[in-house]
Amino acid sequence: MREIVHIQAGQCGNQIGAKFWEIISDEHGIDPTGAYHGDSDLQLERINVYYNEASGGKYVPRAILVDLEPGTMDSVRSGPFGQIFRPDNFVFGQSGAGNNWAKGHYTEGAELVDSVLDVVRKEAESCDCLQGFQLTHSLGGGTGSGMGTLLISKIREEYPDRIMNTYSVVPSPKVSDTVVEPYNATLSVHQLVENTDETYCIDNEALYDICFRTLKLSTPTYGDLNHLVSLTMSGVTTCLRFPGQLNADLRKLAVNMVPFPRLHFFMPGFAPLTSRGSQQYRALTVPELTQQMFDAKNMMAACDPRHGRYLTVAAIFRGRMSMKEVDEQMLNIQNKNSSYFVEWIPNNVKTAVCDIPPRGLKMSATFIGNSTAIQELFKRISEQFTAMFRRKAFLHWYTGEGMDEMEFTEAESNMNDLVSEYQQYQEATADEDAEFDEEQEQEIEDN
């Protein structure tokens, strides 16, 4: 079977990861001790995508938990599903990265990375046919961003032909946890551009907005935000875990979603959004799902897709529904909003359908968009980066760990290149001169 090895790094990564395991354990009928109490064979049919079967019929998540301080790990361990993880798969340091990317990437993290890779190797060896890796982390802190990207590049070296998928929480425009977020995020993006196949950009502010506006929560907690993220993660991986009429795996997704290797930053969305306490009392229809799914208010990254154009889109529907209706609705959206889809990639919307809906819903849809509007997010980080870097503010924390200013300059220009690549394809049309395209291609290759 096509297994996925899951890695969660840093505080944010571990909290999102823990939520993710709660949700998919629930979907597969697995209780907090790892025992199966489900009611359908379908739950077990492809359970080994995410779980190892241990002796006595226990199911153990194929998860590796990494952090540079023990705090978050302890709270995961004492959380609702804390006992389901394999104890050897908790790898943590004592010192913490102190929100410093350099500590995560070069000093503290580099000391711990070999013991993490040993665990990764163990997990990969117990796989029958490893499909790829998924990492949950944030880009604003020290461990998830610095050590997370270090892990990615090390795993890339060892498993070059496996898909590398990340769920990356990007610093928000308004909600900021740390002053040095722009530095950490820019240095991380510099790595992600080169080393991942698919990166889902998730943004706390967008999640807050969804909680306020759609879910009507007056004071959203991180628990609520993480619940939204885990819904998306569960949706993206549905096709791998359950049989469906039209299946997609990580690689198919990458092939359909990434027209140019550097442009692999996606905006996720989910429908129907329901507040945690209130299970909905109305029947959902496919048209409603598609409508809500493409709605700008539904995006989990703080970018407005109406400010750019979609290069590609993937939609994953869950539940019993007519394929014909799904296809009609998707076409309908594309025809009505054709100006928001680039015309030089015909049929750029891929749909997958899985028969099994999430707990408590008749049907749901997960949206993944590769839109040029994501450049807003990178522009925002880049502006904040430049403002601080121009004055060399806070730099001593990084140079003190052995980093060089050059590395900052490189990361900055790589991010700016990314923005201009998105911009270039936003403006490109189908009938421009081919010569112009070749020159551009050449430039991109030279960069």
Swiss-Prot record:
The entry marks the following residues as binding GTP, namely Q11, E69, S138, G142, T143, G144, N204, N226
Residues that hold Mg(2+) according to the record: E69
Checking SMART domains in the record gives: Tubulin (SM00864), Tubulin_C (SM00865)
> Principal place where this protein is found?
cytoplasm
Q: Residue spans with biased composition (Acidic residues)?
A: 429-447
**One GO molecular-function annotation for this sequence?**
GTP binding
Under CDD domains, the record lists:
beta_tubulin
* One Gene Ontology CC term in the entry: cytoplasm
Gene Ontology terms describing biological process: microtubule-based process
PANTHER family linked: TUBULIN (PTHR11588)
User: What assembly does the database describe for this protein?
Assistant: Dimer of alpha and beta chains. A typical microtubule is a hollow water-filled tube with an outer diameter of 25 nm and an inner diameter of 15 nM. Alpha-beta heterodimers associate head-to-tail to form protofilaments running lengthwise along the microtubule wall with the beta-tubulin subunit facing the microtubule plus end conferring a structural polarity. Microtubules usually have 13 protofilaments but different protofilament numbers can be found in some organisms and specialized cells.
Q: What family does this chain come from, according to its entry?
A: Belongs to the tubulin family.
Function as written in the Swiss-Prot or TrEMBL entry = Tubulin is the major constituent of microtubules, a cylinder consisting of laterally associated linear protofilaments composed of alpha- and beta-tubulin heterodimers. Microtubules grow by the addition of GTP-tubulin dimers to the microtubule end, where a stabilizing cap forms. Below the cap, tubulin dimers are in GDP-bound state, owing to GTPase activity of alpha-tubulin.
Per its record, how is this protein called by name?
Tubulin beta-1 chain
